[in-house]
Regions:
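Gly/serine-rich nucleotide phosphate-binding loop at the start of the catalytic core
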Residues: 2-91
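Active-site-proximal, Lys/Arg-enriched surface segment
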Residues: 53-54, 83-160, 170, 276
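Short, conserved catalytic/metal-binding motifs centered on acidic residues
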Residues: 67-68, 112-126, 153, 200-209, ...
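Electropositive, glycine- and tryptophan-enriched low-complexity nucleic-acid-binding patches
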Residues: 78-82, 87, 138-199, 291-308
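A short acidic-Thr-Gly-centered motif at the start of a beta-strand
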Residues: 95-114, 188-196, 212-215, 315
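Short amphipathic alpha-helical "interface-anchor" segments enriched in bulky aromatics
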Residues: 122, 319-350
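An internal, acidic/charged active-site-proximal segment
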Residues: 168-298, 383-387, 394
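Basic, amphipathic alpha-helical segments enriched in Lys/Arg and hydrophobic/aromatic residues
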Residues: 345-401
Length: 418
């Protein structure tokens, strides 16, 4: 007796579960890598180009294994890993080149004012073998974390925000440990503003309001005859004036009648305006000289504890202009969110050596700069924009061109077969 065999259906449709991947880079994308510094050996330049593109288009886990899923067959995880492990090429050379190209490709502001903003952030990690990972917290009101700390220097004008440099903050026990302010001065001293910038305003919170930082800005202002350098920092109340009185006494004993009401427009992604009560005073601070100190609070009857102190070395600025400049510091907080959520900063599983970790962090910044150049036409003047929207537009355009390229190859194959 012959046992009946189960009925089988042979499908003539292609297997839609088969992994789909990109196979080529369109000319519009390849031309953006043209002129890149020649630091490469072997085929690492091609692998680097695909790493940047995959860092943008990948929406899932941006580990090296995840980035290689949609890449061509010859672009594998171990090629990405060997690229990051290679010690002959310098990440900072490439980062500075991509930053310069991004600045050149964007329109020049009418007022020719460039804002240089610095701030620190962290990326959580779990691997204890990472030499850059450390335990800490931002302040006593925040929870403890374990991860990598870093400082980013960015430039901004109009609605644009462009990272130009970054430094990792090593654990305190490391022999090469440097404080955040030392890293900030290193980045600022090597930063060269574009030729169109006539005024350079350095903006930072109270963590970067160190006297050495301000002296460096004043020194660059004296040495640079082509432009004016200034700063607007939030400042601690422990600073003393030349007469020996502290700023704490100024905040505590200034009556409400001395404050005046003012307002500033909100950032482009918000409607309306912000209202503040301010008091400005020309004074002489120790180690700095003549400055303008601005006391600002959100309500007339707000107490001294909720009053913020701002300081600037440009005496011609009004209190309203000072708080409007300091408001631009929020752009770097948006940048951190876009780098971590949109471009997967620090998600590469790279450990053991610091240069590899530095390169894995810098790849996200280079991808950010590359995406700005590729989709600069999507940023409308005076309107808010997001790296998430630019990323979506870039991915959809790349998929469309990949489909057209694949169809053209199939049609040519059919023509040759006919």
């Amino acid at each position: 007796m012959v046992r009946d065999r189960p009925f089988q259906v042979v499908s003539t449709m292609p297997d839609i579960k088969r992994k789909w991947s990109f196979t080529w880079l369109p000319p519009a994308i390849r031309i953006l890598f043209k002129g890149m510094p020649g630091v490469w050996r072997h085929r690492h330049q091609l692998v680097f180009c695909w790493l940047i593109v995959m860092q943008i288009v990948t929406s899932g886990a941006r580990t090296l294994s995840g980035l290689s899923q949609s890449a061509p067959g010859f672009i594998t995880e171990w090629r990405f890993r060997r690229l990051l492990s290679a010690g002959y090429w310098s990440l900072k050379v490439l980062l500075h080149w991509f930053a310069e190209e991004a600045i050149k490709s964007l329109p020049v502001p009418e007022n020719q004012v460039l804002y240089v903003i610095a701030d620190g952030s962290k990326k959580d990690k779990r691997g204890p073998k990472n030499p850059a990972a450390q335990k800490g917290r931002l302040n006593e009101h925040h929870a403890w974390f374990f991860g990598i700390k870093f400082v980013v220097l960015m430039v901004a004008w109009d609605d644009y925000r462009i990272p130009v440099d970054f430094q990792m903050v090593l654990p305190k026990g490391h022999p090469d440990y440097k404080k955040e302010n030392e890293l900030f001065r290193h980045m600022l001293s090597h930063f060269q503003p574009p030729d169109w910038a006539k005024v350079v305003m350095v903006v930072g919170d109270a963590a970067f309001a160190a006297k050495d930082n301000m002296k460096l800005i004043q020194a660059r202002d004296k040495a640079d005859s082509q432009r004016c350098w200034g700063f607007v920092f939030a400042i601690a109340r422990t600073w003393n004036m030349a007469d020996g009185k502290s700023l704490r006494n100024l905040v505590k004993h200034t009556p409400h009648s001395c404050y005046r009401k003012t307002w500033i427009p909100r950032l482009p992604d918000h409607k309306g305006r912000k209202t503040f009560w301010i008091f400005e005073k020309l004074t002489l601070l120790k180690h700095l000289g003549d400055v303008t100190v601005v006391l600002t609070k959100k309500g007339r009857n707000v107490g001294p504890q909720n009053t913020k102190l701002l300081v600037t070395n440009l005496l011609e600025l009004t209190g309203r202009q000072v708080i409007d400049i300091y408001q631009r510091r929020w752009a770097i907080e948006i940048l951190f969110k876009e780098l971590k959520s949109g471009l997967g900063l620090g998600e590469h599983q790279v450990t053991k050596k610091l240069p590899r970790i530095e390169k894995s962090l810098g790849i996200a910044l280079i991808a950010y700069l590359f995406l700005l150049r590729a989709r600069k036409d999507d940023i409308k003047p005076g309107k808010p924009w997001s790296i998430f929207q630019l990323k979506t537009n870039f991915t959809m355009d790349l998929i469309q061109k990949q489909f057209q390229h694949s169809m053209a190859l199939e049609i040519n194959k059919w023509k040759k077969a006919a």
